[in-house]
A protein has these predicted regions:
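Short phosphate-binding loop-to-helix
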Residues: 5-18
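Residues that form generic nucleotide/phosphate-binding pockets
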Residues: 18-21, 49, 119, 153
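Conserved catalytic-core segment of NTP-binding enzymes
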Residues: 37-143
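Residues at the C-termini of beta-strands that transition into short coil/loop
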Residues: 3, 61, 98, 151-153
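Switch II (G3) loop of P-loop NTPases
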Residues: 1-7, 26-42
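Glycine-rich phosphate-binding loop signature in dinucleotide/nucleotide-binding domains
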Residues: 22-29, 52-53
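A short acidic, often aromatic-flanked loop/helix-cap motif at beta-alpha or helix-coil junctions
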Residues: 5-8, 101-103, 134-137, 153-159
């Protein structure tokens, strides 16, 4: 059974039934907490479940985005998100997603991974990096991070992503 409600705007939204489903022992849920404290505020309702040992929370770092391009920005943004959501820092795992969009080059991806490592590694381990599936063969031998090839599903007409 898959529970989905389409959302057409980037707004803090919570669908019904999440708490009930999260209490099921075999529940697997993917929740997007947004890029700032406004979007993360909705996660506060789930804080007890999200802080449980079986939960895994990722903070996605894209060094090409304004809120995660410098350690100070990451610290401020993550601090605000954790403050309003009541999620414990110990629960947060870091993943790198260095991209400039659908046309990110292999070199941009590798440079972005190095930037994330330089900023984050002294403080927390980086679990893995997401790389567009088409770039994976070009970067898999040159990146120090574990890689998760991904496919883009969300696209916009003006990008003409193939």
């Amino acid at each position: 059974e898959f529970h989905l409600e389409p959302q057409w705007a980037d707004a803090p939204t919570a669908v019904g039934g999440v708490l009930r489903r999260r209490k099921e022992p075999d529940c697997f849920a993917v929740m997007d907490g947004g890029g700032d404290y406004i979007g993360a505020r909705a996660l506060g309702a789930y804080a007890p479940q999200l802080n449980a040992p079986q939960s895994l929370i990722y903070c996605v770092i894209n060094p090409f985005r304004q809120w995660s391009d410098h350690l100070e920005h990451i610290d401020r943004t993550l601090g605000e998100i954790l403050g309003v959501s009541h999620i414990h820092l110990e629960q947060v795992h870091i993943l790198a997603n260095p991209n400039t969009g659908a046309y990110t080059t292999a070199q941009e991806f590798l440079d972005g991974c190095r930037r994330v490592e330089e900023m984050i590694s002294p403080y927390k381990p980086i679990e893995f990096a997401c790389v567009r599936q088409q770039l994976y063969p070009q970067v898999c031998g040159d990146c120090a991070l574990a890689l998760l090839p991904i496919e883009l599903y969300l696209s916009y007409d003006w990008l003409a992503v193939e």
